[in-house]
């Protein structure tokens, strides 16, 4: 896996996209920042390793992770289709990826758009579960509160208004991959309990 990680870190599509985001993204994207993209990339690879995915799948996941928020370069609402098209264009131009692989990466990125009713996320490709879990991994990690504050700052709302929205999201959210369930479920439950306690203070 170490050789694969080195290979992916040297993948031009990943490097160029991450560097472009770092130099170009709106600095008021406090949550959807270049650091978030790097975090999702790292987390995606860790989840893929945990579930022993093959090297080609890990590469496709890494490309999807690098591009999953690239649409923010053009607009904030409904940015996912833009990022998906950026990924497809870059993969096509490289000449190293089949049409099926391009379609797979496109669908993974489209799947990162949160669903407004019912389940918060829906996987429509065989690799989407690992990207989706990486994208919302903070729900089941120690940095849950820090990331929640960053999102509130980005949305320009008070944390008191952010917390009920976060609770609603967590109630509709389920981990999609086996690794996501193993690594994040317990901490997400603990974070949810702490969130409920915080909300109860305001009542």
What are these regions (language model features)?
Residues 25-54, 67, 114-203:
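Divalent metal-dependent phosphate-bond-processing catalytic cores, especially two-metal-ion Mg2+/Mn2+ enzymes
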Residues 40-44, 78-94:
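An active-site-proximal "capping" alpha-helix that borders the catalytic cofactor pocket
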Residues 51, 90-100:
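Inter-helical turn/loop segments and adjacent helix faces that build the functional surface
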Residues 14-18, 50, 80:
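Short catalytic/metal-binding and nucleic-acid-binding patches
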Residues 28, 32, 71, 75, ...:
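Conserved aromatic-histidine-acidic binding/catalytic patches
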Residues 40, 58-74, 83, 105-113:
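His-Asp-centered metal-binding catalytic motifs of divalent-metal-dependent phosphohydrolases/nucleases
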Residues 1-29, 33-37, 41:
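Conserved N-terminal diphosphate/IPP-binding helix and adjacent helical/loop segment
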